[in-house]
Design a protein with these regions (language model features):
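The feature captures the beta-strand-to-loop junction immediately N-terminal to the Walker
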Residues: 38-40
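Helix-to-loop junction immediately C-terminal to a conserved catalytic motif
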Residues: 53
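Q-loop/switch helix immediately C-terminal to the Walker
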Residues: 74, 81-97
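Conserved ABC ATPase signature
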Residues: 118-122, 126
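Hydrophobic anchor residue at the start of the ABC signature
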Residues: 132, 160
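A short, proline-enriched helix->beta-strand linker immediately N-terminal to the Walker B motif
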Residues: 137-141
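Catalytic Walker B motif of ABC-type/P-loop ATPase nucleotide-binding domains
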Residues: 143-147
């Protein structure tokens, strides 16, 4: 039981009563597991994340979760343009992590100088790696990953997932994707969602 980082029981959610997005949905995630939520646009993938994060309230069921971090779909929306990457990571991590950077930055193909830049000065790939860095330094039990590769080309996309798996091997990862090949390649389990709201 100590290994369980996400436990969703009998979850029901709808925007319209006659079109449930989830009906008695159950999901258990353990440390080290990577589970992909696969489905088309409108099938409820992002809704599930909003429910887990507490941004939406379900009509029924319970969600028990451990410490969460998230990597967003658009790397350019992951950081505020007014502050440096370093300032924003510090604000979230809230501890001295300078020593950890020596180990993690080379694995992400980042250097310290990049962290003192602002988001508009960096490429999408660099920002996505900065998002991974932030997640790694947060040391979450559960990482929510929302289509992290959609803005990247195929080779870079797989590199990003390899980095996540390598650097967060003890963390459970819940990946939302519309790329079935990506899901098959990296997942322990795949959950297919139907177009519930269509």
């Amino acid at each position: 039981l100590d290994n369980i980082v996400l436990n969703i029981k009998n979850l029901s959610f709808y925007y319209k009563k006659d079109s449930p997005i989830y009906s008695d949905f159950n999901l258990v995630l353990q440390k080290g597991e990577l589970v992909s939520i696969f489905g088309k646009s409108g099938s409820g993938k992002t809704t599930l994340f909003e429910l887990i994060l507490g941004n939406l309230k379900s009509q029924n069921g319970t969600i028990e979760k451990s410490k969460i971090s998230m990597i967003f779909q658009d790397p350019f929306n992951s950081f505020h343009p007014t502050y440096t990457i370093y300032e924003q990571i510090s604000d979230v991590v809230q501890r001295d992590f300078k020593e950890e950077l020596d180990k993690v930055l080379p694995k992400l193909n980042l250097d310290l100088e990049i962290l003192y830049k602002k988001s508009y000065e960096l490429s999408g790939g660099q920002l996505q790696r900065c998002s991974i860095l932030r997640a790694v330094l947060q040391k979450p039990d559960l990482l929510l990953v929302d289509e992290p590769t959609s803005a990247l080309d195929n080779i870079v996309a797989y590199d990003v997932m390899k980095l996540l798996i390598t650097l967060l091997k003890d963390c459970a990862i819940l990946l939302v994707t519309h790329d079935i090949n990506m899901a098959k390649w990296c997942s322990n389990r795949i959950i297919r969602l139907k177009d519930a709201d269509k």
